[in-house]
């Protein structure tokens, strides 16, 4: 079932790695929370809920400017505050390459799918018309391009992370004869390396998460075996971290069991 979407409108999900554009999205401040139970079981309000991060592709219009975007961010934040939505935060992600599908991504972070659904429904009923009028000609959502994921923390976020950051999405498929056990072994070895690196060079701003899609693949997008998201607090930390990483055998180990594509982005916190 397909739905035309506005910025906060109730939609179905799809996973995106199309031929022209593999993916754009980012997570900041993710929560590691256990999965929800079966829908056939009674709801336990005390049970942990699954955090959700979703990405809304945006296309610039003829009247776009950075100043106009800032005014719209302020207006959107006022609406979200007035609506009282249970939202962890929001970011904007700009690809550091040239996708032909969109110009930037608006990222929404929720403590649960229930909180997400309530906010989308309430926003549509109370603010949608005004919001669409305000941003007409400046930017627009891409139809159907709203994508949700469940995050799991691989390395804790460091205190050095601020309102701007660098992110890199690694879309990976296992090579023939390899699988999850090889990824698990690599993550253990990588964690040991990070511990040693921090002891030698001090604590940096690097952290990472694994992202699992909450939807079925579509004609435009196919699943990969795993999705690894790296995050740094600055471009300088990213470059120096990669330089030290290149002196190890870890990349060779990773290339042995899987083949990955990297997609770099710059991001900033807007809520």
Which role does the model predict for each range below?
Residues 3-20:
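Short, Lys/Arg-enriched N-terminal segments with co-localized hydrophobic residues
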Residues 21-29:
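Sec-dependent signal peptide recognition
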Residues 36-271:
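Short S/T/G/P-rich N-terminal loop/turn motif that feeds into the first structured element of a domain
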Residues 1, 13, 29, 37-38:
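Intrinsically disordered, low-complexity segments enriched in Ser/Pro/Gly/Ala and basic residues
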């Amino acid at each position: 079932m397909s739905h035309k979407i506005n910025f906060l409108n109730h939609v179905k999900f799809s996973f995106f790695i199309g031929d022209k554009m593999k993916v754009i999205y980012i997570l900041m401040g993710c929560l590691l929370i256990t999965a929800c139970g079966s829908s056939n079981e009674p709801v336990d309000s005390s049970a942990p809920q699954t955090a959700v991060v979703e990405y809304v592709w945006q296309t610039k219009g003829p009247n776009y400017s950075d100043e106009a975007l800032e005014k719209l961010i302020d207006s959107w934040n006022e609406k979200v505050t007035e609506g009282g939505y249970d939202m962890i935060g929001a970011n904007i992600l700009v690809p550091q390459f040239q996708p032909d599908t969109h110009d930037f991504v608006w990222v929404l972070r929720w403590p649960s799918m229930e909180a997400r659904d309530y906010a989308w429904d309430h926003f549509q009923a109370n603010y949608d018309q005004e919001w669409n009028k305000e941003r007409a000609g400046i930017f627009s959502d891409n139809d159907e391009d709203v994508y949700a994921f469940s995050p799991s923390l691989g390395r804790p976020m460091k205190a050095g992370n601020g309102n701007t950051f660098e992110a890199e999405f690694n879309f990976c498929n296992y090579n023939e004869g390899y699988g999850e056990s090889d990824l698990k072994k690599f993550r253990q070895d990588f964690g040991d390396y990070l511990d040693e690196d921090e002891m030698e060079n001090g604590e940096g701003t690097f952290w990472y998460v694994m992202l699992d899609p909450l939807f079925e693949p579509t004609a435009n997008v196919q699943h990969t075996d795993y999705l690894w998201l790296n995050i740094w607090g600055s471009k300088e930390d990213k470059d120096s971290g990669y330089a030290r990483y290149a002196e190890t055998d870890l990349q060779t180990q990773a290339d042995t069991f899987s083949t990955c594509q990297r997609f770099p982005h710059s991001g900033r916190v807007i809520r």
